[in-house]
């Protein structure tokens, strides 16, 4: 006789950091998000990046065309900041409801970020405009200097970029995305109400040992890179505390299998199919399920000044095996936790 399964009912969540790509990949991955989440902040790092209102409107339409009938999903678009971006274009997009936020990628920090910002000073007029109109700034918080160790790039970013920026523009709303270190967890926790953070499932579940000991696991390779276990533990403690300025952002970032399993593999975990159950597992392990709904469904809208979703979903606690792969037109996509047995999943 099997034990009765446990059901967890929560307000429909949102994903505050998501990569959907474009073309066939977009069509493949969108349904994995749209069946679960009400909204998602969509990253603009296409090639070429989304830097105009027209490009964002067109991209939003391509996303909506990929949403299956019966899914109620709203993509929230972002503008990719560049050294040459016109502040008026950004403000127009924000006022017209096209841009929800703008994304700062330090040049060459991650996938398709070669057009990114060379220095904060180069975009100060844009940032000043964002502060004035109340537009959130989303930050990939890593320095990219060649002499800075990859495991130190987030901590160094806080002291050399993030803190000086926030001291200069004190009213600017900032989301420190996909934080991975104790340094960042402490910084956000000790900050004011204009600073928030997202955390991915992989950074809560794993540390660099899981990626590197006993063989390299390319499907755990993402940026910012997994850190040592003391940092993982700090992130877990932050979410388990019920802190209300940290929220769900999967950073789901699909790449075809041959681009991950390569002599020079791409960074990114495609976790959209398994992320919500992964978060539930972490909260359960931390005896913090009472804070799970707020992390998934309340804290993000609260920071962005948006209403919470008015529908609900259920997760069920019963073991099931994650698919080994998902078909693409001419390759496959390997989901986060592929082939593994997981405890929680969204009830269909």
Swiss-Prot record:
The active site is at residue 251. Zn(2+) 1 binds at residues 17, 19, 103, 251. Disulfide bonds: none annotated. PROSITE patterns: DIHYDROOROTASE_1, DIHYDROOROTASE_2. The modification N6-carboxylysine is found at residue 103. It holds the Pfam family Amidohydro_1. Zn(2+) 2 binds at residues 103, 140, 178. Substrate binds at residues 19-21, 45, 140, 223, 255, 267. SUPFAM superfamilies: Metallo-dependent hydrolases. It comes from the Bacteria. Pathway: Pyrimidine metabolism; UMP biosynthesis via de novo pathway; (S)-dihydroorotate from bicarbonate: step 3/3. The keyword Zinc-finger does not apply. Keywords: Hydrolase, Metal-binding, Pyrimidine biosynthesis, Zinc. GO terms for molecular function: dihydroorotase activity; zinc ion binding. HAMAP family: PyrC_classII. NCBIfam families: pyrC_dimer (TIGR00856). Catalyzes the reversible cyclization of carbamoyl aspartate to dihydroorotate. Belongs to the metallo-dependent hydrolases superfamily. DHOase family. Class II DHOase subfamily. This is Dihydroorotase.
